[in-house]
Curated annotation (Swiss-Prot):
A single cellular component GO annotation: cytosolic small ribosomal subunit
SUPFAM superfamilies: Nucleic acid-binding proteins
Entry protein name: Small ribosomal subunit protein uS17
Organism ancestry: Bacteria, Pseudomonadati, Pseudomonadota, Gammaproteobacteria, Methylococcales
Listed transmembrane segments: none
Subunit structure, interactors included: Part of the 30S ribosomal subunit.
Entry similarity comment: Belongs to the universal ribosomal protein uS17 family.
Organism: Methylococcus capsulatus (strain ATCC 33009 / NCIMB 11132 / Bath)
GO biological process: translation
Name of the gene encoding the protein in the UniProt record: rpsQ
Keyword annotations of the record: Ribonucleoprotein, Ribosomal protein, RNA-binding, rRNA-binding
Entry's Gene Ontology molecular function annotations: rRNA binding; structural constituent of ribosome
KW GTP-binding (keyword) present: no
PANTHER family: 40S RIBOSOMAL PROTEIN S11 FAMILY MEMBER, SMALL RIBOSOMAL SUBUNIT PROTEIN US17M
Length: 86
């Protein structure tokens, strides 16, 4: 067993769309340093995630876990809803 097999990769992000059936779009923000000036810049990545029970709404803060590919673009599953939208 290698070191990466024992732990499931997880990320936290905000739900930006839930219009699809059992699928949510999650925006994951990260900060990167500008190569020349050193200022930290926000970068956003959008990923599709599987929401089996359609329980997420727009604005929720969620945790995603990596999984086997479910479709062409979807390889994440909903782990937990950390914070509900107001």
């Amino acid at each position: 067993m290698t070191a990466s097999e024992g732990r499931v990769r997880s990320v936290t992000g905000r739900v930006v769309s839930n219009k699809m059936d059992r699928t949510i779009v999650v925006a994951i923000e990260r900060q990167v340093s500008h190569p020349l000036y050193g200022k930290y810049i926000r970068r956003t990545t959008k990923v599709l995630a599987h929401d089996e029970n359609n329980e997420c709404s727009i604005g929720d803060l969620v945790t995603l876990h990596a999984s086997r590919p479910i479709s062409k673009k979807k390889a994440w599953t909903l782990g937990a809803i950390v914070e509900r939208a107001v």
